[in-house]
Design a protein with these regions (language model features):
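Short, conserved DNA-binding cores of transcription-related domains
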Residues: 1-82, 88
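Short linear motifs at secondary-structure transitions and domain/linker junctions
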Residues: 2-7, 11-13, 43-44, 50-54, ...
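A short, sequence-level motif marking secondary-structure junctions
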Residues: 33, 91, 186-190
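A short, polar/proline- and glycine-enriched secondary-structure boundary/capping micro-motif
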Residues: 38-40, 97, 192-195
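Short, low-complexity, polar/charged sequence segments that are solvent-exposed and flexible
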Residues: 46-50, 87, 96, 170-174, ...
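Glycine-rich loops and low-complexity Gly/Arg-rich segments
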Residues: 52-55, 64, 101-103, 176-180, ...
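Short, positively charged, Gly/Tyr-enriched micro-motifs
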Residues: 55-152, 156-163
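RNase H-like nuclease fold core
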Residues: 134-198
Length: 198
């Protein structure tokens, strides 16, 4: 049984229409296999093509540039009368330019490789990888469960001279995870007023 190239990109719900090869790149054109309403699951939908998307996928062998092309559709459900732009399951958000699989690979390699080395290897912009890492860290540390905090560390740092006096920040961290719990202006007890509420 032949394995289609788009399976290596962890793409489901699409089929391969065409493939173009060159020395350093592969372009895979995809087509949705079945359209259904995301709310009621009905397949009785009207499909309206909106635009074509081109995103980057994981490298295949010596081909570092893998492009996936597909058309985004607007769906109208005849059962529940809901109108919505279709969800693409292999993208982390509607405006993503990389597949979830490539994003995951970059995030797994990032602790071991510099941003510039990853950008050079995948032929991406430095800012693309930096933004991906920032988004991941924000998601990871945005929801800190204060019930699980066993020990905190409080640090006051000098950030420079202001108009009339010295300026400080007070940083409160969870010592186990290293997550920042609170950043307060100034130093002393007044900078910790919000933190003490948990």
């Amino acid at each position: 049984m032949p394995v289609n190239l788009y399976y290596t990109q962890r793409v489901r719900g699409f089929q391969q229409e065409s493939v173009k090869y060159s020395k350093e790149s592969v372009e895979i054109r995809l087509k949705r296999t079945k359209h259904q309403c995301p709310h009621c699951g009905s397949t009785s939908v009207t499909v309206e093509p909106i635009r074509s998307r081109r995103i980057r996928g994981e490298p295949l062998g010596s081909c570092r540039k893998v492009a996936l092309e597909f058309t985004i559709h607007r769906l109208y459900c005849h059962s529940c009368h809901h109108r919505e732009i279709e969800h693409i399951p292999f993208l982390s958000h509607p405006k993503a330019r990389l597949t979830k699989a490539l994003e995951r690979t970059i995030l797994e390699l990032r602790p071991h490789i510099s941003i510039q080395a990853l950008a050079n290897f995948y032929d991406l912009r430095w800012h693309t990888i930096k933004e991906l890492e920032k988004k991941h860290l924000k998601k990871k540390y945005s929801r800190i469960q204060t019930a699980h905090i066993k020990a905190i560390g409080i640090d006051e740092i000098h950030i420079g001279k202001g108009m009339q006096n010295q300026q400080y920040l007070t940083i409160v961290r969870d010592l186990q995870s290293g997550a920042v719990i609170h950043v307060g202006d100034g130093k002393g007890i007044s900078a910790l007023a919000i933190t003490c509420q948990f």
